[in-house]
Swiss-Prot record:
HAMAP family: MurG (MF_00033). It is an enzyme of class 2 (transferase). One of its GO terms (cellular component) is plasma membrane. Belongs to the glycosyltransferase 28 family. MurG subfamily. This is UDP-N-acetylglucosamine--N-acetylmuramyl-(pentapeptide) pyrophosphoryl-undecaprenol N-acetylglucosamine transferase. Keywords: Cell cycle, Cell division, Cell inner membrane, Cell membrane, Cell shape, Cell wall biogenesis/degradation, Glycosyltransferase, Membrane, Peptidoglycan synthesis, Transferase. The keyword Signal does not apply. Its main location: membrane.
Amino acid sequence: MNLKDKNIIITAGGTGGHIYPALAVAEMLRENNANVTWVGTPNSMEANIVPEYFNMQYIKSSGVRGKGLKRKVAFPFTLISSTLKARKILKKLKIDLVIGFGGYVSGPICLAAVQKDIPIIIHEQNAKIGLTNRILAKLATKVCLAFDVEDIQKRLSPKQLAKTQVVGNPIRKDIIALNNKTKNITENGKLKLLVLGGSQGAKSINNIIPDLIIEANKQGISLKVWHQTGKLSFEETKNNYNQVPSTHIKDISAYITDMTNAYEWADILICRAGALTVSESAIAGVPAIFIPLPSAVDDHQFFNAQNMVKNNAGFCIRQDQMTLENLIDIIKPLYEDRDKLKEISQKAKNTLIKDSSEQILKAVEQILNKK
C-alpha cells in the first residue's frame, strides 16, 4: 500500500528499548511514503536521537509510578496540560493514525487521539506489559505484543485480546540480515565473548568479567572479550583489566557503535535482558547468558529472558547468583562442545519473529483502509 498523504505520529520515549523499535517502524512507514512525525519529551533520550531522522514535536510528560507525593499530586495537572498540547498537534498535522511504543509520553498523545476519534496502535516490547500500555490497551484499535506470554494475556480482557496480535520486536534491517547468514561459531581455540554492560553501565557485570577471564583460563577455558562497559564504569573497568593478558582482550570501550559487527563477531554474550537486547541477540543468533536488572519494573527483564530459556535458546542467572562458578558452569560445556553452541545459536534465530515491522505496517494499512 502506498501511504502517500497519510499523516502518522510515532510516540515513544525514555529508553532505547522504546525508541529503537519505534525508529525501525518509522523508517518503514517513510519508505511507504507516509508523513511521519515523532512526539517525545524535551531533554530526553529521544530528543537526542530522533531529530536526525524525523521531524519531532514535544510535549511535557512524566510518570507517577513509584514517584514522591509531590509528583503524584502534580501528575493529573501535567496529564491534562500535555493532553491538550497533544490535541493541538493532532489537529495541526491532520493526523490519521497514532502508534505508541510505550514510555510516559505515549499516554497523552494516545489519549488525545482517542478523544479526537483517531485510531491508535500500541506496541509492548517486554514480556510484562507496562503501566501506560496497560491503560491504553483498553482504548487502542490494535494491540501489538513482542512476546506470546500468558502473563500479558491474563492482564487483558477478552475484548482487548480480540484486537491483540503477537508481532515481535521491530529491529534494524542490518541485524535482521544476520539471521539469514550462517553464524560462524569459532571451531576451536578462544571463545569470543561479547559483554554488554549497557549504555549506562552495569557495575556488577563489569566487575566480574575480568575475574571470569582469569578463572576460566585456569580451568582450561580460553576466552577473548569485547566489553562494552557503559560511560559510568569505563575507567574503573578498564583498570580492572590490567590483570588480564592482552591476548584475551579484543576491545574495552564505553559504547559499541556498530552492534551488527559485534553480534557477528561474538560466539557468546553476557548482558542484561532488556527487550531490545534479547530480540537483537536472538535474531543475530548469539547465544546469551542474561543477567536481568533486579530493579526492572515488574521484574520484566527476567520474564524477557525466560522466552529464550524455555526454548533452550539462552541462559539466565539472577544477579545475586552471578558467581564465577555459575558463569563457568554454563560456559565450560559450550567451550568444549562447539556443536552445542551452534545448536543454541540456531534455536535463538528461530525463537523470535523476524518481520515485526512488516506486520505492524500491515496493521496500519488495514486500519487506514477502514477509515
